[in-house]
């Protein structure tokens, strides 16, 4: 791995991707969405059925206060173990993925999937940590999240980092090169979620990202 990443708090990661699955059923929105709309999650449940899905690997915040939340968490950990045992995943070692997510309104959001150094993160207001929160943290949501992770063999984090890059040095070169990159996935998202594509960065592109981020640090 490029040593430059060590001072950035953001790294390439070993990323798990499902093999030979219905990707529309596999991918669901982040657990902190539609918290007051249980009907949305019920529709997702009906869409997924018995297919392998990240729905089985997350705890939607709509269920945080459910009376059977401990049972729900045990089911999540069991599903993780079963998916690993069944060989559901393939591993992209030490990788970054460039993502283009087309929203239902046609707008495209661009991003980069990697790994965040949580030791460099602090959600305390006014913190000077390398990685800081952009909004307030709801403390009572932490315990059930921690409980899911306590026995979890894999991670499904929902962390979004914002980068101030006025000269467009990090993402835009990847957008321009997308047609030449290895495409990892390309599918419609359920529930009118739009469309998503993912591309694996080459070693040269990973090094370029490290250099660009170092220039912004």
PLM segments and residue spans:
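Glycine-rich phosphate-binding "P-loop"
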Residues: 179-207
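N-terminal extension/subdomain marker
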Residues: 1-188
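Glycine- and acidic
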Residues: 128-132, 195, 213-214
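A sequence-level detector for short glycine-anchored, His/Arg-bearing signature motifs
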Residues: 149, 204-217
């Amino acid at each position: 791995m490029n040593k430059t990443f060590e001072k950035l708090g953001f790294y390439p990661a070993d990323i798990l991707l499902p093999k030979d699955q219905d990707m529309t059923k596999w991918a669901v929105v982040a657990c902190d969405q539609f918290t007051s709309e249980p009907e949305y999650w019920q529709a997702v449940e009906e869409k997924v059925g018995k297919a392998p899905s990240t729905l089985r690997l997350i705890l939607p915040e709509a269920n945080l206060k459910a009376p059977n939340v401990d049972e729900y968490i045990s089911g999540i950990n069991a599903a993780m173990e079963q998916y690993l045992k069944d060989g559901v995943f393939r591993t992209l070692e030490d990788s970054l993925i460039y993502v283009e997510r087309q929203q239902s309104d046609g707008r495209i959001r661009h991003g980069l999937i990697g790994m965040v150094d949580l030791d460099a993160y602090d959600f305390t207001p006014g913190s000077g940590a390398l990685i800081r929160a952009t909004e307030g943290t709801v403390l009572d949501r932490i315990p059930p999240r921690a409980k899911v992770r306590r026995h979890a063999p894999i991670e499904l984090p929902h962390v979004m980092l914002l980068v101030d890059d006025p000269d467009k040095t990090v993402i835009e070169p990847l957008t321009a090169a997308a047609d030449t990159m290895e495409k990892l996935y390309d599918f419609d998202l359920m529930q009118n979620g739009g469309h998503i594509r993912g591309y694996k960065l080459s070693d040269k592109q990973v090094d370029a990202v490290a250099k660009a981020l170092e220039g912004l640090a």
